[in-house]
Amino acid sequence: MPKIVVVGAVAGGATCASQIRRLDKESDIIIFEKDRDMSFANCALPYVIGEVVEDRRYALAYTPEEFYDRKQITVKTYHEVIAINDERQTVSVLNRKTNEQFEESYDKLILSPGASANSLGFESDITFTLRNLEDTDAIDQFIKANQVDKVLVVGAGYVSLEVLENLYERGLHPTLIHRSDKINKLMDADMNQPILDELDKREIPYRLNEEINAINGNEITFKSGKVEHYDMIIEGVGTHPNSKFIESSNIKLDRKGFIPVNDKFETNVPNIYAIGDIATSHYRHVDLPASVPLAWGAHRAASIVAEQIAGNDTIEFKGFLGNNIVKFFDYTFASVGVKPNELKQFDYKMVEVTQGAHANYYPGNSPLHLRVYYDTSNRQILRAAAVGKEGADKRIDVLSMAMMNQLTVDELTEFEVAYAPPYSHPKDLINMIGYKAK
């Protein structure tokens, strides 16, 4: 009976194991998870903190016991894989509760250890990061136990923005700082102004080009010279792949610690796959490498690996498009395609339109800003971005499908919109992009 070992039990690992079991009823499947919880919804965590998700249990799909009862898959939490011997096809495992170590053999090894939150490195009892359900519980319990009011949020990426919004909605008083003036880097810089407008509208303090110099109890000294007091600090300063344990093996890592994979999510070592935040692959629509540590990619990779292990040799990954979205108070920010800083590798043109998300005479209309970049050599779409209170998600998803099928910007005129006054225009913003490009 083949033995399949999975490292990591969240989006990629748990999904892959589940899909393998759906296709293969016989194999022995074991998942090692270094932390307390398995199969939780990472993207739900800020909303648990904000009490938008009313019960944290809604963010937890399975316990190990439930997973075994439903799928006959063994999940061992607090078990950290600390080394791989790919020549003997074994992994070394540390039981973090007992501090005991043991070896586990495998026929197939699936690596989905995810990433960990970066830290600024200050020794402080009021400083937290958010990466898993344990972090979420710690933040929630600290807020309740210490009657937290003033919270400093460090960083201005997706997670920090979501955390700040949810702290505000919970009734706390957050302040945002960021070390540069470049916020929300997945979005075009000049399309981020509504973020600052939303902060100003709610009188939420923020400072760009600001950093922490020192923390002394609740007293924070900043690079600017300001000294302020906060009850709590939440750091959202990026992540790094959990790949240290892989260095002992023959598995190739890139300079940032990610694992390059082929179109089957195979590593350079036979019988070892890598999926989720740790894997780096390529874009679908252009010839560039891509690392897209988001939920869709982890789930797609899980299905592809499961199909292969079950015997489907023809299935392949065709690449990322990098579709991403975030809600910040009343606005939605969405984009798809290459990152803004990757556009310089192409000879491109940009076309954009700003108009109401639906018919102007229908109540509740608000402006939607849609922008498309296309390659001048073949007029295919490289990147699209949208910002507005309504309809950004729909337009970016349509453009994602257009890019998946390598449509040109001119072909957007042929997009047949589902039109009624509450939803769109007879000539949608997507159509208008095509017309303007001509």
From Swiss-Prot:
Its cofactor is FAD. The active site is at 43 (nucleophile), 43 (redox-active). Keywords: FAD, Flavoprotein, NADP, Oxidoreductase, Redox-active center. Substrate binds at residues 15, 19, 22, 39, 42, 71, 299, 427. It is an enzyme of class 1 (oxidoreductase). SUPFAM superfamilies: FAD/NAD(P)-binding domain, FAD/NAD-linked reductases, dimerisation (C-terminal) domain. Its EC number is 1.8.1.14. Homodimer. Catalyzes specifically the NADPH-dependent reduction of coenzyme A disulfide. Contains 2 FAD binding domains and a single NADPH binding domain. This is Coenzyme A disulfide reductase. It comes from Staphylococcus aureus (strain COL).
